[in-house]
């Protein structure tokens, strides 16, 4: 059956497969022969085979953990019949002797060899195995009942590990492992089914040929379309693993030849056929060109033809790179990703040079006007997307170095760093040296390494040899960078303009300088900077009538700060930046110092009622190191002026155990009771430790000093209440917001002249079934010293004392009525109205569990002790209804230390609720899984 396979190639592996798919498409039986060569330079005593279907076989595999990081728990909660697993496996050597394996569930099968396999020699392995295919909803591969998508299920050698010693688990990252192999695959499939794949089809259900990527097959009840193209006399067929709408197919028949011709000019050659699966299309399409839908309204950014063009250029580009370039994705992901983005940039320059990032959306009229025209975002070019994505993540200090191993790259950095930043740097080099020479280097490198595993450092070396100004790239890719070019000043000397450019790096990086006259005439100069020299002086003729000078316009280079790249040579703002007032938060325009002035209307509490005011701040959609915000308001409840203000500065070292160190000063003036105001002044510092952007773990240390002044009522004055007090606090916080086991811990100490206390709080939430959770909170508080005059600073049992004005309470001083029923999970955390406060120590536990849909049960128990009184045990229980989880929830007490509460006449007054109106919390919850 397998005769002649070894004759295909002297040094290339061969795999022969006969695969039979069951009628329900859930089981696959495979008879297989592998001719494996020792590609290392040493004797092999074991051969490793990848058994990646076992990545789907249980909880706890690397694949399950990665999916949970992506906020996807489908595989974790999968039923047994949805999992993938190896059911049987028999492996024999060329002497028909069975080779033992450790376990069918292992993703890496290490086979002991009877005799050492010398370098260059081959071994023939006979395999017979049967597997259960996983559900396609987990990774896009497996079975859906209607179709089977086969990729990474055949047992194959790992060509990136010629020594056969390192484990490589499946992470669903589209990595090639069985490249440079001759495949023969014959299928036995259910009746009325069709099979398509990325191997040349030699007859019905049979495929044969070389692949530098992994084989992929689609077996379904439908025969999907294909489009044949003739490019410079060569026929290229593009096959699809999904249906095309008539309009989409018509558009593709027009655009695919353009794409393929463009790519052939840049890369030199094209494969004879291209297979695009539904999963590949979804992964590699153009990010950010989808229509915006809101309720029943749909706002298109681009026409259907433009979307097809943009989507499929990226899809086709990446598919061709995957088929023609052999790269270890774990280590060298940036090469193909960067080339894809570079080629996209070249395509956009040619066909979408002036197209805006928001497409035709700014032309949308609402009540006869075009409101988006007021935003700078409406003027940003589509080409700017590459630099903007890097800016967005870098300014949060959540970027990663370009050559970071792919498994630890966050999903957003896969796009923003591996693809966009690398592509921008390639484009930067191409603009400096000329696109023709750069494209020749790319074409020659890809052609030279056809059929071989690439070493991208060699590409960078070739680039540096042809263009010395690109020599910085090798080091640049190995670290997080914060390069900043700055226009220091412009001065006129005789008949020339002297321009001083500063950089914050010793590397020799060129900079693009652009001049512009008042009439809009532009000139471009490339300035080479010297190594170890941070100041560069440029002299330009004064006769050029230069009005404005710009460095690296259009976010062409990944800088840490574009705000110092613009200067005016003439006028009132010469050697300075102009100020621009804006009404609504926007993508920042680095040419201006922007101040956002926006009206504010919000409900504060029952005393201030609605606050009417205006907010002045410099915070755009992107983070900044220096931030200020001032919000004067008019309190409709008191008829007085109120407000708040804050100033902060953050230090964000690129390579450090610290992610950010922020210092801030703030102040506020509002009301906490009828006719009673408070004034608060704060000095605070927060240190956030560095986090792996894929990780859900965050750690921080915070310290603050707060000064308070409160107006007092006559009764409070008579009771010698506190009108002025100072609070010092120091705390440590740890949180892990992973999907199944969420946990957090906080430790803090707080004090003033009359007391010192320490507090600890732990929280754990377990998702034991889809959307069903059990949470446990532990709280402990202890006064080291307590000489206070009243219970203001005591620990609360069922109500918190908001003496620091840090909780959002609708009725700050309410003791009855609906406002007093607001619940804040703090201190003791009891939901029933258990009387009293605690002035010595308290411990409590709060338990909450799902029972059905939005209904939960809760129980609280604890022990507390007040001075000169014995310790007391308290408890409560009840039903919680999660109307909007974590934001609006209602508590119905049932049984507690007080008795059976529904029997009380005032039961309606005992119902509690939480109401969280925090947009930041919503945003943080939404972005989980991206970074």
Predicted regions and their residues:
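Beta-strand-rich binding/interaction modules
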Residues: 196, 274-275, 437-438, 465, ...
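Amphipathic alpha-helical substructures
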Residues: 271, 404-492
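Acidic/His/Gly-enriched intrinsically disordered linker/tail segments
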Residues: 335-424
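Juxtacatalytic substrate-recognition/specificity segment
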Residues: 185, 225-347, 559
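Outer-membrane beta-barrel "beta-signal"
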Residues: 881, 885-887, 908-931
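Extended, low-hydrophobicity, Ser/Thr/Pro/Gly-biased non-transmembrane segments
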Residues: 71-89, 102, 107, 126-218
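C-terminal outer-membrane beta-barrel translocator/porin domains of Gram-negative envelope proteins
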Residues: 660-673, 686, 712, 725-850
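Outer-membrane beta-barrel initiation region
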Residues: 511, 519, 523, 527-529, ...
């Amino acid at each position: 059956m397998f005769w002649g396979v070894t004759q295909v190639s002297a040094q290339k592996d061969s795999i022969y497969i006969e695969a039979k798919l069951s009628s329900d498409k859930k089981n696959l039986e495979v008879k297989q022969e592998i001719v494996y060569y020792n590609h290392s330079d040493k004797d092999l005593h074991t051969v490793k085979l990848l058994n990646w279907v076992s990545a789907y076989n249980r909880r706890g595999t690397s694949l399950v953990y990665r999916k949970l990081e992506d906020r996807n728990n489908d595989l974790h909660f999968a039923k047994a019949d949805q999992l993938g697993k190896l059911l049987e496996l028999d492996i024999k050597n060329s002497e028909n002797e069975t080779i033992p394996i450790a376990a069918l569930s292992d993703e890496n099968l290490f086979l002991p060899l009877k005799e050492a396999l010398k370098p260059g020699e081959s071994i023939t392995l006979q395999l017979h195995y049967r597997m259960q295919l996983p559900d396609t909803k987990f990774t896009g591969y497996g079975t859906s009942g209607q179709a089977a998508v086969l990729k990474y299920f055949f047992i194959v050698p790992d060509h990136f590990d010629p020594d056969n010693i390192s484990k490589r688990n499946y992470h669903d990252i589209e990595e090639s492992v069985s490249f440079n192999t001759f495949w023969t695959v014959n299928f036995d499939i259910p009746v009325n089914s069709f099979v398509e794949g990325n191997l040349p089809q030699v007859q019905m259900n049979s495929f044969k040929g070389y692949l530098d990527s992994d084989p992929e097959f689609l077996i379904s009840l439908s025969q999907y379309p294909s489009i044949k193209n003739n490019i410079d006399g060569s026929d290229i067929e593009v096959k699809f693993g999904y249906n095309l709408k008539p309009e989409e197919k018509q558009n593709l028949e027009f655009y695919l030849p353009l794409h393929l011709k463009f790519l052939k000019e840049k890369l030199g050659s094209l494969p004879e056929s291209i297979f695009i699966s539904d999963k590949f299309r979804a992964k590699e399409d153009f990010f950010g060109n989808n229509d915006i839908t809101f309720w029943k309204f749909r706002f298109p950014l681009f026409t259907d033809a433009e979307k097809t063009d943009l989507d499929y250029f990226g899809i086709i580009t990446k598919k061709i790179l995957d088929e023609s370039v052999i790269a270890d994705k774990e280590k060298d992901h940036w090469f193909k990703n960067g080339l894809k983005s570079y080629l996209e940039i070249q395509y956009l320059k040619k066909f979408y040079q002036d197209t805006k990032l928001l497409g035709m959306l700014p032309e949308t009229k609402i009540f006869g006007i075009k409101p988006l025209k007021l935003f700078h975002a409406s003027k940003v070019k589509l080409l700017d997307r590459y630099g903007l994505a890097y800016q967005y993540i870098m300014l949060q200090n959540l970027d990663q170095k370009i050559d970071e191993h792919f498994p630890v790259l966050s999903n957003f950095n896969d796009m923003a760093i591996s693809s966009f930043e690398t592509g921008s740097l390639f484009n930067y080099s191409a603009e400096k040296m000329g696109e023709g020479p750069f494209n020749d280097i790319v074409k020659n490198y890809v052609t030279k390494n056809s059929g071989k595993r690439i070493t991208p450092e060699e590409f960078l070396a070739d680039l540096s040899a042809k263009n010395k100004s690109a020599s910085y790239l090798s080091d640049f890719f190995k670290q997080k960078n914060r390069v900043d070019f700055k226009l220091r000043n412009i001065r006129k000397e005789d008949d020339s303009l002297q321009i001083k450019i500063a950089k914050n790096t010793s590397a020799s990086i060129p900079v693009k300088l652009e001049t512009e006259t008042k009439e809009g005439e532009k000139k471009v100069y490339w300035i080479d900077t010297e190594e170890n020299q941070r100041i560069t002086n440029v002299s330009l003729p004064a006769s050029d009538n230069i009005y404005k000078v710009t460095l690296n316009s259009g976010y062409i280079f990944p800088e840490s700060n574009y705000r110092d790249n613009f200067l005016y040579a003439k006028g009132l703002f010469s050697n300075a930046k102009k100020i621009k007032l804006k009404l609504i938060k926007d993508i920042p325009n680095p040419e201006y110092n922007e101040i956002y002035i926006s009206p504010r209307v919000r409900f504060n509490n029952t005393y201030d009622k609605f606050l009417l005011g205006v907010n002045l701040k410099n915070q755009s959609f992107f983070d900044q190191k220096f931030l200020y915000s001032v919000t004067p308001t008019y309190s409709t409840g008191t008829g007085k002026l109120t407000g708040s203000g804050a100033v902060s500065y953050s230090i964000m070292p690129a390579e450090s155990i610290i992610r950010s160190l922020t210092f801030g000063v703030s102040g506020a003036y509002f009301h906490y009771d009828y006719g009673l105001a408070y004034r608060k002044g704060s000095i605070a510092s927060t240190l956030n430790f560095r986090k792996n952007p894929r990780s859900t773990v965050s750690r921080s240390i915070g310290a603050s000093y707060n000064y308070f002044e409160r107006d007092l009522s006559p009764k409070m004055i008579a009771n010698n209440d506190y009108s002025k007090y100072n609070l010092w606090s120091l705390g440590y916080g740890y949180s892990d917001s992973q999907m199944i086991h969420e946990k957090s811990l906080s430790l803090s100490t707080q004090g003033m002249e009359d007391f010192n206390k320490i507090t600890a709080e732990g929280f754990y939430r377990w998702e034991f079934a889809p959307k069903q959770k059990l949470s446990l909170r532990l709280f402990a508080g202890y006064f080291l010293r307590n000489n206070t005059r009243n219970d203001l600073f005591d620990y609360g049992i069922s109500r918190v004392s908001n003496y620091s004005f840090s909780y959002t309470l609708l009725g700050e001083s309410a003791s009855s009525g609906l406002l007093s029923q607001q619940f804040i999970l703090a201190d003791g955390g009891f939901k029933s109205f258990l009387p009293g406060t605690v002035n010595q120590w308290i411990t409590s536990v709060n338990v909450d569990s799902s029972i059905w849909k939005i209904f939960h049960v809760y129980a609280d128990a604890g022990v507390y002790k007040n001075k000169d009184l014995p310790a007391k045990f308290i408890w409560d229980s009840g039903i919680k209804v999660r109307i909007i989880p974590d934001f609006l929830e209602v508590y119905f007490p049932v049984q507690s230390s007080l008795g059976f509460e529904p029997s009380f006449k005032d039961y309606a007054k005992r119902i509690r609720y939480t109401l969280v109106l925090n947009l930041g919390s919503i945003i943080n919850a939404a972005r989980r899984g991206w970074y």
